[in-house]
Amino acid sequence: MLSPMAKDEDSTAAPFDRVENTGSQSQSQSHSQSQSQTESHSHSQPQSHSHSRSHARSHSQSQAFSHFGSAVTPAASSTWGLGEPTPSHHLSSEASTSPAESWRLDEFVTDPGYLAYQEELRCLIFNTAQTAAPTREGTPEAADGGFSAGGFAAPGTILGDEGAARRQAGQILGTGRRLEYLKNYVGEVATWLDMFDSDRAFGIQVPVLARSSPALLYAVLALSARQMERKEGKQTSFDSLELYQEAIRLLTPLLQSRDQKIIPICTILCCLEMMSASAQDWRKHLEGCAALFESFYVHGFSGGLLQAVFWCYARMDLCGALISDGTESTLLTPSKWLPNGASHNEASELFHQSGTPDMHANYAVYLCAKVCELVADRTRYFELGDASGCSSPDELTDRWIRLWEDLQAWTRDRPPELLPVQSIQSSPFPQILFLHWAAISSNQLYHTACTLLLGSMPRPLNLKLGGVTGSAIWHAKCICGISLANPHQGCLNNAIQPLWVAGRLLSHKSEHALLVKLIRSIEAVTGWGTCWRIDDLEAAWGYKVRKELRIADMVR
């Protein structure tokens, strides 16, 4: 239960009731930078909303935040101390020599063929979404798309003879590096698609289905090839482009048939597009998938493969909301992540009913999306005078309190699989080690959601938030520490936006240097374009971090 708290925040009081809270939590208050400086330098807003952002910035900070708190500002140098990075920080060690050192528009993204096929796919998807929707939500069996009952190529389906399709798959894999791409997909790419799915739908079920679906197989190969090209720093001659185009060619008749089996294929192709997309284009690539999920009534509780595909999409949609920096919610509103007719008040029970660590982790994704929705509604209400997302400041306050309580209940009710196996005080960030894949990102999203909520705390409401739990700096350090201690590729991909949220609050140069090296390393290791966020962070910090700067240099 929340209770009034004293004016000055005591970040060392009442230890957080989990093992993460083992380090020093005090923070000094000097050298803080204003949020207005942070926001004015951000380069990450989608272009379609540049007008609203400009309009919002024209309001003074005091006017915009007078009723509903203020943005979290970068805090001062922490008393966590300095020192050499521990072995768990190895991700950043090779950043300065990475072939993918900064995000660039390579020839894949600018190729006229890619752009033409991308637009064709987008139009086909929207046409399918507009004409495919049933008159009511289907049964759970129908919602799974019939994957478990016959896969993509059962006799009599639109793909024809299953044996012929499998022979075609063998011919496809016999060309060039395609078998290598399939191995890379199973061993590397699928692990981050399956990050919140212990049943490994993308790693096991999708490759099995791809044997009888050339369109799905080409989509898998295209995504894997693109990831390898990004890691290798290729600038020309892309196998992924040919594979992408062939996947769309084969997908076209499936889209025209308005079959739910198109959804995994479209989501995988969306992942490929997102891997190289600029921040301005992020949401554009998600819009088609959002329309398909909505029109086919696929949600986070559909069951089977489609449920796994939905949560893969949902994590990308959440990243898009985080990129918008408080101006946008997710494309698919969080209410549509739940079964038809379910309300937010029922969400906790729905997620808990599954009794699995995966769904508890997905609950963290949902709660973070709800926080983004609240922050976006708050921005529109106070900065733009748009009351479409809420009716009054009191409603925003009630939603804020409810979400804060939901987040604390989430961390309190974590199953053993989502708890850290070790948490060690270290400098400049704590080391928080998890064993379960889903534990890594879900705990990081919990800290991200708390950071965002603390940055939009209602005023003049004073709440006792429970020691370090009420410290945005503590949450920011945990976000960074989790990524440094847990080098799972899927979790690193999903960490970029949380690291941006956290990084703006860091003030010491040792923290900045380590975070920049980490972000460079993530791009080099995973192939995802990430380094554009370094420019945003450096703009927020007010200086450029030298690539050769070492933590040891800061100690002197």
Residue ranges and their predicted role:
Residues 1-253, 257, 280-556:
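Intrinsically disordered, low-complexity activation-like regions
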Residues 266-281:
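Internal, conserved structured core segments that host functional sites
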